[in-house]
Amino acid sequence: MKFVLFPLDPVHDVALKMLNRELVRKGHQVILLPPDTKMEEVVEMCQKEMPDFIMVSRTVGYGAAELLARFIDMLDAAGLRDRCKVVVGGKAITKELATELGYDAGFGERTSWDEVIAYVEGREVEKEKLKVKKSKRDITQGYTYQILDPAFKQLLDKITDQILDWAKDRTSPAVERAKIKEKVLEGEDLIEEYLKLCDETIVSYFKKNLLPKKVRLITREERKKFDQLVKSLNFDGRILRHTLDKPLVFVQYGTGCPFMDAMHIKVSEAWGADGVLHFDPSWGARCEGLLEGLLAHEEDGSIITLENLKLIRSSLDVSTLWCVRAHRGLNTPETILLAARAGADLTKINMVYGSLNGGTDPERLTVDGVYALKLAARYNLPFDIPTNEELGGVPAPKAFAGMLVVAHLGVKLNAKPILKPLFCYSPDVMINDYMKDNYIDYNVAKVIALRQIMDAPIWPGEPIGFMTHTEDRIQSAMTTALHAALASSLRLDAITIASTDEAYARGAITVSARIDTLRAIAEAFRFFGQAKIEPTKRAEEYAQMIVNGIYETLEKVAKREDFVASLYEGLFGTREEGANPGRAGRGTVRKC
């Protein structure tokens, strides 16, 4: 076929040059005219050449409709309109505008060359070829979980063996509730036994139908409308990473309303998020027992119930990874159970952070954590280990020592840990000027240190860039994107990001703020591609300092020969550093 390509533009003809390449490659005859060719000249040439297609491009928006209308009229007057197909494309073009002006077809921004070639060749566009294909990924694949330094392995073995020996004949209300709930889910009627182990808030809900403050039931009609809405949503998701397959990008949700959560998730999926994390209300961590049913909550945090989790799960794309947080409260084992039954892919367990900065008693959370790790192994739920005690001021070496203990403990119980250091501007960093020059070196040092000790996936959180964000949306998106680029440069497995209004939110988190950061990250990944960010020599110095600090902490804990006592006594972080052993659940552990 013969084509005349005409840039109806003073200077811009890049798109037509690219189209020329595609058409020539397909064996077509092409006449490419230069920019600023007069319409009269084009008409005269077309009368001589009699092309099958006249293809016009218009990049500049002003005056586009008038110029394009005039050109189609000139072709009509010359008798070419019925003999040639006339197609228009460019940033200023929409399909509706092309039809209105009398063109045979119009192609706007984001059109692929496959679509254009398919049109001129008279065939259907291969939709599957054009559609972005995402698949669910296993973050833990390819890792051995080997402790790479024998000296560290000796210490970690001693500490974790002591934990397992100590916990083997101890139980708690949470452990017993999880055992009961498992039987209830299999059909046994044990609600009375369950409620004997619950706080009055939970008992009143089941026996008196009294809802906790600011909690309401979701109606059947609301559920029906939700299902209809989710089914009606149809979009082609995006892939944020440019030429790399790491890191996966996770967003946090927990608006209080499962419906709102689902909509935030769908928007995040549409803009490229690979996974989502469920955050529950803070009061849920301090309440013995869990509620049931479809429930909405007026404040931050979405209530953990099997029904709520299943509702949210029903809204997820098949490729989206789903993590349910369970690591810091009085319902850790049961949360793992419900997450697994609802179809979660991942969970979150860290007894050290949960007891030093999460408000739960160390003895209680150690017992609960060991049982939770067993459940995670049984249900094949990889678990991440956030070192959020860093945000309270605990130095990274001590926080990492705790993380590695929990990771090695998980491996011994056949679970799959994911290391989660913080990419943050923590109090310890501020006090010691570790980031006085840049945010790169100390964060890189954390990764270098962990990779020297254990072969395990690394997923910085939560979110990356914490304490570097401000209320300015542009600044917030920028700092998140730069931290994401650093994670990409380090070839890390995943990252958790915040929306631009999340770190300093004084109200509801908005969907547009989620898009801010996802778009910024996509641009950062595109900008760097396979290129890497180069730290200064201080990164290696900091890394060695962190490794030494981890070893010293583990050595003290191993010598103490009592993990729980080490938590109480400040070996994983002192009160002066920001570690405050929790009180929730104190005195509830018993021998069994």
Task: Describe each region flagged by the PLM.
Residues M1-L5:
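Conserved hydrophobic helix-helix packing surfaces used for dimerization/oligomerization
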Residues D9-P10, V14, P460-S489, D493, ...:
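Active-site-adjacent loop and "lid" segments of alpha/beta metabolic enzymes
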Residues K17-N20, V24-D104, R110:
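Cofactor-cradling patches in redox/metallo enzymes
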Residues V24, L68-R81, G237-R241, S302-D317, ...:
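Surface-exposed amphipathic alpha-helices with a cationic face
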Residues V30-L33, F53, A105-G108, V276-L277, ...:
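Short hydrophobic alpha-helical runs that function as membrane-insertion/retention elements
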Residues V60-A64, G106, E128, D138-V429, ...:
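Catalytic alpha/beta active-site cores
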Residues A118-E128, T360-G369, T500-R526:
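C-terminal helical cap(s) of enzyme catalytic domains, especially alpha/beta-barrels
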Residues K127-R137, K158-Q162, W166-T171, V175-R177, ...:
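Long, compositionally biased intrinsically disordered regions
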